[in-house]
Amino acid sequence: MLTYPQIDPVALAIGPLKIHWYGLMYLIGIGGAWLLASRRMKRFDPSWTKERLSDLVFWVACGVILGGRLGYVLFYNLDEYIANPTLIFEVWKGGMSFHGGLLGVMLAVWWFGKRHGKSFFQLMDFIAPLVPIGLGAGRIGNFINSELWGKVSDVPWAMVFPNGGPLPRHPSQLYQFALEGVALFVILWLFTRKPRPTASVSGLFVLCYGIFRFVVEFVRVPDAQLGYLAWGWLTMGQVLCVPMVLAGIALMVWAYRRDAAQPKAA
């Protein structure tokens, strides 16, 4: 059994002002995505400036935060937030939905593309390899917050979490960090080293994320207010991942078929 590192969720306190690690992880994710995007920007569009890139990252970040929070409210805990609406603004306590964040990003990208003459999938393909940076940082934030831990286990790397009872559990946040953060980043980085059909990068992203998340849900404790939805093992996260996997496969098939049907330059 490993020892859980006792990390204060508050990274810095200045009088009444408290800066939480969870919020800092989002800033790290957004900053890391911007740095990587600035390296890839000229390959994407030589006419782009740092100002336009910053504009895109800003709106995508808004989509992540607003969509992620509203998605959690709608998908996971609607009754509690209806009863206590002010809880919606307490984001430092956790409670973000990746699937809601993805919908928020899609809306932001569609709007940005309309303004700047880029297609939806051109922008999504550019953004997709950047997302694992934020996903990985967010999972570290979950770990520090001692939330979203896994089921009771006797594996050698199990941990006793401060608010998870006396028994050791799977550190499922670290599994998600390794898969959604590190592995997904490497897969997309290698895949985009050479030109790919439009929408194929987006398709690979949602396919891999859906698979990784579906698998980890088997060892992660479901949200207490929902529990298992069916068969004693199906979680809301898995339900939301099924359409992602199907959409990812469909996007990749469509992208490559569309590319093959286009006339090639002599």
From Swiss-Prot:
Pathway stated in the Swiss-Prot or TrEMBL entry: Protein modification; lipoprotein biosynthesis (diacylglyceryl transfer)
Membrane topology: Multi-pass membrane protein
UniProt binding sites for a 1,2-diacyl-sn-glycero-3-phospho-(1'-sn-glycerol): 139
First-level EC class: transferase
Residue ranges of the TM segments: 10-30, 56-76, 92-112, 120-140, 171-191, 199-219, 233-253
GO CC terms in record: plasma membrane
Entry keyword annotation includes Cell inner membrane: yes
The protein's Enzyme Commission number: 2.5.1.145
UniProt xrefs under InterPro entries: Lgt
Domain of life, per lineage: Bacteria
NCBIfam families: lgt (TIGR00544)
Function of the protein: Catalyzes the transfer of the diacylglyceryl group from phosphatidylglycerol to the sulfhydryl group of the N-terminal cysteine of a prolipoprotein, the first step in the formation of mature lipoproteins.
Stated family: Belongs to the Lgt family.
Protein name according to UniProt: Phosphatidylglycerol--prolipoprotein diacylglyceryl transferase
Lineage, opening ranks: Bacteria, Pseudomonadati, Pseudomonadota, Gammaproteobacteria, Pseudomonadales
